[in-house]
Curated annotation (Swiss-Prot):
Stated name of the protein: Retinol dehydrogenase 16
Superkingdom field: Eukaryota
Origin organism lineage: Eukaryota, Metazoa, Chordata, Craniata, Vertebrata
Gene3D superfamilies: NAD(P)-binding Rossmann-like Domain (3.40.50.720)
Entry comment describing in which tissues the protein is expressed: Highly expressed in adult liver (at protein level). Detected in endometrium, liver and foreskin. Detected in the spineous layers of adult skin, and at lower levels in basal and granular skin layers. Detected in fetal liver and lung.
Membrane topology according to the record: Single-pass membrane protein
MF terms (GO), sorted A to Z: 11-cis-retinol dehydrogenase; all-trans-retinol dehydrogenase (NAD+) activity; androstan-3-alpha,17-beta-diol dehydrogenase (NAD+) activity; androsterone dehydrogenase [NAD(P)+] activity; electron transfer activity; identical protein binding
Length: 317
């Protein structure tokens, strides 16, 4: 009996391995639009897909970022400046994409643009702090997607949304985790709706990687600005030791960040060119072995773990 079971399991994984490695043909005819290509995942993915031969349409926030990217890629790659928080900028970029792809449609849309700041305990933040992140990470994703869906549907293509392990388990305050939970929900509903048209939707859920989003210097600068503007009552409740512990946790976070960004961009590439893409991709060992399992744990257990490892306020009970 155990032999039959072992054979069955072996055949299952062999079939899974084979399906995972089937790649689409005619990649050179397929257009992919990527947001957030100034640096990090977006920039590396644009270079990676360009080397693969795909027609990359790269959106950068700044002209400087676009110029740098063009200098590192082939003449086939084209760039456009895009601020995902401004509807008029999104509309202009969508029109540009439409002119580029013409009747072929848009094979791939990668919503990669994102920010992580301001981040701090919720009580220290304002409504505008939440809006700042949600405008980019969630509403920007929605605006870009809705503007380009007709082109993706025409090509029966792919939508790839960059979420995070923090879209599976919320470990700190501020708009970042909220925005990623929103991306997960938007992607789930979008996947079901677009399945009728042959369009596939995938989510990338990276762990901690060394990018501008996880920059210790930016994180600490933002946090100290938030702390300085906080009310005396809040400062008294949290205390200076909390600030010191928060700084220390930021430094530890940066040390734990994975530097190999290709672990994420390879997932993005697979979602775009595989015959059988996954629905979700957990990128990084911390995502696979720590945060993803945490998302399935009982809530009380996750709360207990976070209570134990997080900085403690001065007036904690």
């Amino acid at each position: 009996m155990w032999l039959y079971l072992a054979v069955f399991v072996g055949l299952y994984y062999l079939l899974h391995w084979y399906r995972e490695r089937q790649v689409l043909s005619h990649l050179r005819d397929k257009y992919v639009f990527i947001t957030g290509c100034d640096s990090g995942f977006g920039k590396l993915l644009a270079r990676q897909l360009d080397a693969r031969g795909l027609r990359v349409l790269a959106a950068c926030l700044t002209e400087k970022g676009a110029e740098q990217l063009r200098g590192q890629t082939s003449d086939r790659l084209e760039t456009v400046t895009l601020d995902v928080t401004k509807t008029e900028s999104v509309a202009a970029a969508a029109q540009w994409v439409k002119e580029c792809v013409r009747d072929k449609g848009l094979w791939g849309l990668v919503n990669n643009a994102g920010i992580s700041l301001p981040t701090a305990p919720n009580e220290l933040l304002t409504k505008q702090d939440f809006v700042t992140i949600l405008d980019v990470n969630l509403l920007g994703v929605i605006d870009v997607t809705l503007s380009l869906l007709p082109l993706v549907r025409r090509a029966r293509g792919r939508v790839v949304n960059v979420s995070s392990v923090m879209g599976r388990v919320s470990l700190f305050g501020g708009g970042y985790c909220i925005s990623k939970y929103g991306v997960e929900a938007f992607s789930d509903s979008l996947r079901r709706e677009l399945s009728y048209f042959g369009v596939k939707v995938a989510m990338i859920e990276p762990g901690y990687f060394k990018t501008a989003v996880t920059s210790k210097e930016r994180f600490l600068k933002s946090f100290l600005e938030i702390w300085d503007r906080s009310s005396p009552e809040v400062k008294e409740a949290y205390g200076e030791k909390f600030v010191a512990d928060y700084k220390k946790s930021a430094e530890q976070m940066e040390q734990k960040c994975t530097q190999d960004l290709s672990l994420v961009t390879n997932c993005m590439e697979h979602a775009l060119i595989a015959c059988h893409p996954r629905t979700r991709y957990s990128a990084g060992w911390d995502a696979k072995l720590l945060y993803l399992p945490m998302s399935y744990m009982p809530t009380f257990l996750v709360d207990a773990i976070m209570y134990w490892v997080s900085p403690s306020p001065a007036k904690a009970l």
